[in-house]
Amino acid sequence: MLDIRLIRKEPKECEARLQKKDPSISLERLLDLDKNVRQLKADSESLLARRKALSGQIHKAKVANEDATPLIQGVNAIADQLVAFEKTLQEQEALLLDLMARLPNYPDEDVPVSPDKSGNKIIKSHGEIPTFTFPPKHHVQLNEKLQILDFKLPAKTSGSGWPAYKNEGVLLEWALLTYLLNKQQAHGFQLWLPPLLVKRDILFGSGQIPKFDGQYYRVEDGEQSLFLIPTAEVVLNGFHSQEILNEQDLPLYYAAFTPCFRREAGAGGSHERGLVRVHQFHKVEMFAFTTPEQEEIAYQKMIGIVEEILSELQLPYQLSLLSTGDMSFTAKKTIDAEVWLPGQQAFYEVSSISKCGDFQSRRSETRYRDAQGKLHFVNTLNGSGLATPRLLVAILENYQQEDGSVVIPHALRPYMNNQEILLPKTDR
């Protein structure tokens, strides 16, 4: 959520900043509604003052044994007006809140301005793209002999986009997750296994709704709707909603492992088959609550952790500074870490690390008290540390051998009983 006071003060400047993300944004209706709401509040306060004055006159009239009927009628008329004003005010405030809730975060000044991902800027490349002496296979082809994934059986139970891991695929997945969690703990992150279902107001607080309403799996629990989380960012942000933190306790670094659920699997087309785009996947999420002064330090820390992971896994990767047209709704700046997938002949995002400023904390009402006792909204940051499906794809495709076997990265071997290679089933 943006600060309405800044929009009132600098409407043209705010509109121009928002149009960098979405050129169709106009603040005209919002400003008109805001003006109406403030006028209604002022009129209501005037009526309340008038009613109070009349009530005083009624009391005096009764003490003096005078006829107070006209005064009482005046008070009753004001009461009727106030009821009408209150109804109109509630309606106008709801409309204003909805408009405010649909405005994205302002992009930082150093973010490239572009309508889409074509404006993304590669800021770092690391590692060599592998060259093979044989035609490299897509991970779905590799799996035909490895048999560590199953796409057909879960399609029976759940539909397309819901793969299952099996055999050594399970062990490799858990090796990855254990390695990732250990890495987060080593860097001072508090580990969490949080709930997977959240209330609607928690989705609102993280910025998922109302902008993307209808894109999440929903469960009806009596009179309350609960939503399966698309990312642990949602629940970690919600942990401190409507709280006042102490400045000396900041920054707070959290890391959570969760399954994540998204309805848009398959949106990338048939070429993104297999694990590249799915409805359910595992992810370790990093999240931080900071002061504005701590924000950049936390941001670089998160980026550094992601780079350390990809370097230790010896995967070729690049860092991309996302343009305004490719950034998320809540982010003011995002850097994507992208790994090379030989099966796609392209780099694919495995982590997005974003600064959100006070955008989420205004929605969640998460503040901190400084040494002088003054209250401020916290800054929030989030980043994948990492999502495993594409990471697993990257390992299978980059470490594949001509015979269809896959070498296990050295960093993961301690978590797989020092196993060094995945062999095709026919070779076992």
Curated annotation (Swiss-Prot):
Domain of life: Bacteria
Full protein name: Serine--tRNA ligase
Keyword Ligase: yes
EC numbers for this chain: 6.1.1.11
Gene3D superfamilies with a match to the protein in the record: Bira Bifunctional Protein, Domain 2, Serine-tRNA synthetase, tRNA binding domain
A GO term for molecular function: ATP binding
One protein family per Pfam: tRNA-synt_2b
GO cellular component, one term: cytoplasm
Taxonomy of the source species: Bacteria, Pseudomonadati, Chlamydiota, Chlamydiia, Chlamydiales
One annotated GO biological process: selenocysteine biosynthetic process
Sites where the protein binds ATP: R262, R263, E264, V278, E349, V350, S351, S352
Pathway terms, separated by semicolons: Aminoacyl-tRNA biosynthesis; selenocysteinyl-tRNA(Sec) biosynthesis; L-seryl-tRNA(Sec) from L-serine and tRNA(Sec): step 1/1
Keyword Amino-acid biosynthesis tagged: no
Residues reported in the UniProt entry to bind L-serine: T231, A232, E233, E285, S384
Catalysed reaction, written as an equation: tRNA(Ser) + L-serine + ATP = L-seryl-tRNA(Ser) + AMP + diphosphate + H(+); tRNA(Sec) + L-serine + ATP = L-seryl-tRNA(Sec) + AMP + diphosphate + H(+)
Subunit structure: Homodimer. The tRNA molecule binds across the dimer.
Role summary: Catalyzes the attachment of serine to tRNA(Ser). Is also able to aminoacylate tRNA(Sec) with serine, to form the misacylated tRNA L-seryl-tRNA(Sec), which will be further converted into selenocysteinyl-tRNA(Sec).
Species for this entry: Chlamydia muridarum (strain MoPn / Nigg)
Broad enzyme group: ligase
UniProt main location, coarse: cytoplasm
Domain notes: Consists of two distinct domains, a catalytic core and a N-terminal extension that is involved in tRNA binding.
Protein location: Cytoplasm
